């Protein structure tokens, strides 16, 4: 974002890298951070934080939400994490389709499917907070999406739509 890019290479330890691309013909690697597990998806949350969604272990039995502090691009830090059991999930669409993730920093919502539809919020003091967990009719959760209008939230997919109210 801006002159920095954030990426994961999926090599052996799957670190988060920060690079300066202000000179596109001479990019510079500034920092890296090795953490347990790995992120499949990265999303700039605000000016100094990157949201990571991936797995907390090599067996991919736990989904991991991670917030990285990148205020110092030479020393990224994992400031919060949340593990969610996904051992019974048939597939996690967010692994290969970024559209399967709802990441809205302005509304403070993070949503995705893994057996159920999970909706989280984030704040720096309390970390990730589960707002809602909606059971889905089908265990194949591909195609489910979370959408909202004002304080009405909907989970739609596979011929069904569910509604709940977001806290004001």
Language-model region placement:
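Feature marking well-ordered beta-strand scaffolds used for ligand recognition
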Residues: 1-168
């Amino acid at each position: 974002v801006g002159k920095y890019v954030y990426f994961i290479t999926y090599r052996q330890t799957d670190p988060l890298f920060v690079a300066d691309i202000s000179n596109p013909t001479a990019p510079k690697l500034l920092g890296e951070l090795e953490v347990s597990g790995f992120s499949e998806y990265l999303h700039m949350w605000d000016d100094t934080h990157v949201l990571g969604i991936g797995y907390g272990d090599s067996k991919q039995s736990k989904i991991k939400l991670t917030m990285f502090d990148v205020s110092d691009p030479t020393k990224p830090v994992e400031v919060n994490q949340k593990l969610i059991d996904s051992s019974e999930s048939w597939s996690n669409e967010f692994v290969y389709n970024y559209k399967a993730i709802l990441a809205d920093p302005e509304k403070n919502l993070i949503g995705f499917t893994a057996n159920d539809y999970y909706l989280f919020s984030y704040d720096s003091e309390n970390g990730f907070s589960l707002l809602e967990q909606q059971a889905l009719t089908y265990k194949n959760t591909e195609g489910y999406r979370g959408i909202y209008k004002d304080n009405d939230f909907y989970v739609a997919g596979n011929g069904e739509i569910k509604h709940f109210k977001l806290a004001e």
